[in-house]
A protein has these predicted regions:
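Short loop/turn segments that connect beta-strands within beta-propeller blades
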Residues: 91-95, 133-137, 180-184, 239-244, ...
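Repeated scaffold domains used in trafficking and secretory/extracellular systems
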Residues: 65-69, 107-113, 152-159, 196-205, ...
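Surface-exposed loop and turn segments in beta-propeller and other repeat-based domains
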Residues: 29-61, 101-105, 141-151, 188-211, ...
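Blade-level signature of beta-propeller repeat domains, shared across WD40, Kelch, NHL, RCC1
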Residues: 313-353
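Beta-strand-rich domains and repeat architectures in extracellular enzymes and scaffolds
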Residues: 55-85
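C-terminal motif of bacterial Sec signal peptides marking the signal peptidase cleavage site
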Residues: 16-19
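Conserved beta-strand positions in repeat-built beta-propeller and related beta-rich domains
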Residues: 79-84, 121-127, 168-172, 227-231, ...
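Short coil/turn segments that connect the beta-strands within blades of beta-propeller domains
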Residues: 74-75, 116-118, 163-164, 222-224, ...
Length: 353
């Protein structure tokens, strides 16, 4: 019996020793991350106009409203109210009326432009450009009231300004008068020293084909001054530095386009993009273009565009200004505002293996 036990114990020890010399195999289960083909999603934007809002005579206390031009500085909207003989100032976001400014009955406003602390008003038949303090509405002085033809502005139909210069579009004399802001004395009743006259040859307004009752636009874009003649599709531009250095002899770039006729242009939050109101193939459109498009006069491929449809009616001679994805338009006896909205679509594109 004892011998059997000893033999069993010896056998177990030998088995244990043998097992230590063998390789042990185990199946181990663990989480593994395996690369899989991933689909990509293509987003196609679909921008449209909605959220319509208007302002009429009732919103300015029952006074006459004839909005012929406008300008937004991002905080306030300045509206040239020709019938009301004033500039009406609205909150740019809410379009609530804040104040009005005028120089008696002489503010026959055809255009308005804000630059720095001042507001410049092209006063049409008053044959002058009026200067106001932008925040208070205080009248300060006027430009272009001297003797004809040296400094008198025969018809102040349009105005634009940079930190250095003021540009006045004189349709009767078919030129643009330029005033040097550094030489303007805001304490004087009149400032009549003309810095330069930019000739426009026979293309410019003043003929029977360009009625002075219509609204026109000028804008400083990039390094140049642009002036638009919508009936003929003519665009003038001058390098601002050329105007400063060469004055009357500053060369103009003149182009004409019979199918794409810009009436007005507005800066946006992006200094490389602009919104225009234009007639394209006989229909009114609001369209967004890049600075490069404008410089090249390439209006065939806007980044965004909106035309009249069953919901949206665009005035035929509208001036447009951009305000934080909203477009504000002149429309005769009222202001129109449309919000730009987006309803994107998504296209799944499987990745190629």
């Amino acid at each position: 019996m004892r011998k059997d036990v000893m033999m069993i114990s010896a056998g177990l020890m030998m088995m244990a020793m043998a097992s230590c010399n063998q390789t042990e195999y185990r199946e181990i289960t663990e989480d593994r991350v395996v690369s899989q083909p991933v689909d990509t999603i293509k987003v196609a934007d679909h921008f449209y106009l909605d959220g319509y809002l208007s302002r009429t005579s009732e919103d300015i206390g029952g006074r006459q409203l004839n909005a012929v031009n406008l300008f937004s500085d991002g905080e306030e909207l300045y509206v040239a109210n020709f019938a009301g003989k004033c500039i009406d100032v609205f909150d740019a976001e809410t379009l609530g009326l804040k104040r009005s400014m005028s120089n008696g009955d002489r503010t026959l406003a055809r255009d308005v432009y804000a630059e720095g602390d001042h507001l410049f008003v092209a006063a049409g038949d008053s044959r002058e450009v009026q200067i106001f303090k932008k925040k208070t509405g205080k009248y300060l002085s006027r430009l272009g009231t001297g003797s004809w033809p040296a400094s008198n502005v025969s018809w102040a139909g349009c105005v634009c300004a940079t930190p250095r210069l003021v540009f006045v579009r004189d349709s009767k004399e078919t030129n643009i008068r330029v005033f040097d802001r550094n030489a303007i004395n805001l304490g004087a009743a009149n400032n009549n020293n003309v810095y330069a006259k930019l000739a426009t040859d026979s293309y410019f307004i003043g003929s029977k084909f360009e009625p002075q009752s219509e609204s026109y636009d000028m804008e400083a874009i990039g390094d140049s001054l642009y002036s638009f003649i919508p009936r003929t599709g003519t665009i003038y531009s001058w390098k601002v530095q050329d105007i400063i250095e060469k004055k009357n002899d500053a060369p103009a770039k003149i182009t004409q386009n019979a199918t794409e006729k810009i009436r007005s242009i507005s800066k946006t939050d992006d200094k490389e993009k602009f919104f225009v109101s234009m007639e394209k193939d006989g229909k009114m459109q609001l369209a967004e273009y890049t600075l490069a498009d404008i410089q090249k006069r390439n209006f065939s491929q806007p980044t965004r565009s909106f035309a009249s449809d069953s919901r949206v009616s665009l005035p035929s001679q509208t001036i447009v200004t951009y305000q934080k994805e909203k477009l504000i338009l002149t429309n005769g006896t009222k202001l129109d505002r449309w919000e730009i909205r987006n309803n994107p679509s998504y296209e799944i594109q499987p990745r190629k293996k």
